[in-house]
């Protein structure tokens, strides 16, 4: 079995290859549609000829569309392509914004000043771009009056409507009632 040495000086941009792409002698079809190293269409050629062209160019023959009839192969430096794809993935992960969920706990019988303080905390979290999980904790006989919790959560949602939207409606879960608020996107307001 012949091993191909890879040396490349070409960039391969805009080609999506799955993680299990077959290369060089692992491609087991009689003929392929060949794309050259610069993106030019070579046409349908026998697999031996395609491997020879790739070997002569010191590049790899990579199967980019295995389900096509015949499969599409491209001549490229596979090692360099994998490295650039990993760099792009790392860069996109770095640029992703981490969503943080803050939690604010309330009681059904909350005083006005305490409510204002909790509401201001929720507004501050939403302005920073965090999601907020608002939890109302019921104790004892308070559990028999879930409508108090629903009213309190609706009041809070209306008070912070300029800063956040309700992502998950109020729902009761045992002794607690929860609602999730998300920040208002800057493009929508």
Curated annotation (Swiss-Prot):
Species assigned in the record: Corynebacterium glutamicum (strain R)
Protein's name in the database: Translation initiation factor IF-3
GO MF annotation, one: ribosome binding
Cellular compartment(s): Cytoplasm
Function statement: IF-3 binds to the 30S ribosomal subunit and shifts the equilibrium between 70S ribosomes and their 50S and 30S subunits in favor of the free subunits, thus enhancing the availability of 30S subunits on which protein synthesis initiation begins.
Family classification: Belongs to the IF-3 family.
This protein's UniProt keywords: Cytoplasm, Initiation factor, Protein biosynthesis
One annotated GO biological process: ribosome disassembly
Binding partners and assembly: Monomer.
Gene Ontology cellular component annotations, sorted alphabetically: cytosol; membrane
Gene3D superfamilies listed in its UniProt record: Translation initiation factor 3 (IF-3), C-terminal domain, Translation initiation factor 3 (IF-3), N-terminal domain
